[in-house]
Amino acid sequence: MITDDPGTPGNGHFEINTAWTGQRTPGSTLVGLPQVDANYGVGDRLQLNYQTSWNLLRDSGGPMESGLSDTQLAVKWRFYDDGLKLSMYPRFTFVNPGSDADRRGLTDSEPSLLVPFEVQRNFGGIWVNCDFGYTFSRDTAQRGWIGGLCVGREIRKGWELDLEVHGSSSDDLDRSEEILNLGTRVDLSPNSTLLLAIGRDLHNSTGLRTSLLTYVGVQVRL
């Protein structure tokens, strides 16, 4: 899911998500194969994050482009944990040195800094988490606000369903994109979980409308 939560792996533990991602817009399909999202716990409330993917882009009538996407480095800090959980998760995203992926349309051209906050609360077996924040960038197209709401429930032991609405908007709030996602988590073992999600744009005035978003991954906890 796009909306983050305040959870961390725990001191000295890894949480590694390896996935196939897809995004379809009119005349274009972008695939991340694989996307790697690696997390490491420092103490009980800190998480270090590294994320990147190998992207494949096919535009109608053109050749397929492929290459390493941008890189994300992030730190999550859960600063409140007493029924209500609160965290902040600043993340810096940049094009890898020497890469021309931005010129080939595989990633954004300018570095950016997203500073979001996350909130989570459990209501009798239904957990609700939301995030909200701002993206700083020299590129006005990348700059703007983000926010999301995700509701989840464990319908049987080891099987969770999630419903999410996540949005982003321009700096002046005159253009926005809202995405609807349905996801599930299924435990494969005590240390691994299958992650699935499918979604699409509800509205998009920032660019081409996404008709399909997909995520198929496995989380391994070490």
Report the location of each language-model feature:
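Transmembrane beta-barrel domains of Gram-negative outer membranes and organellar outer membranes
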Residues: 1-222
